[in-house]
From Swiss-Prot:
It comes from the Bacteria. Pfam families: Ribosomal_L10. CDD domains: Ribosomal_L10. The lineage of its organism: Bacteria, Pseudomonadati, Myxococcota, Polyangia, Polyangiales. NCBIfam families: PRK00099.1-1. Forms part of the ribosomal stalk, playing a central role in the interaction of the ribosome with GTP-bound translation factors. One of its GO terms (cellular component) is large ribosomal subunit. PANTHER family: 39S RIBOSOMAL PROTEIN L10, MITOCHONDRIAL. GO terms for biological process: translation. Coiled coil: none annotated. InterPro entries: Ribosomal_uL10, Ribosomal_uL10-like_sf, Ribosomal_uL10_bac, Ribosomal_uL10_bac_type, Ribosomal_uL10_CS_bac. This is Large ribosomal subunit protein uL10.
Amino acid sequence: MERSQKEVLIGSVRQKFERMSSAVFLDFKGMNVEAVTKLRDEFRKSGVEYRVVKNTLVRHAIKEHPWAKTLSKSLTGMTGVAWSYEDPSAAAKVVKAFRKDNQKLQIKAGLIEGQILSGDAVETQLATMPGKDELRATLLATLQAPLQQFVQQLNAPLQNFAYLLKAKEEEAGKQA
């Protein structure tokens, strides 16, 4: 590969690291083509970009970041990088689900907001984080709860009055 091509590739990888919300570094040694293709499909469905990149190109692309030295220790052997742009936990969730059926896929490290995570931390912490949609639903439920309680309090006297009338009606029916 010519030097100019390498520079373009390094620039492309650098741009991915600048845009990402998180990244997961994987070792796919021992996996067959079918399994790797299935993994790529799962990443694509989740909006995660996955690419196999030479370790030296990644090192050059991240060298200006303060966490580069720490991450470089994990960049050995074959490395696949999964970048999440929207949902920080998307790549980790795909990897965790995929590893249930394929233990050959190994997590080397993770990266989120400048923090390097171990492979175990990616699987136990990052993969269990709620996604954007889950957080939105939780926020919406939290915002709606006081309003729903207020409406219930407003309706309570009417309900109680209706129960009272029904009880009086049943009592009158028993006396007759």
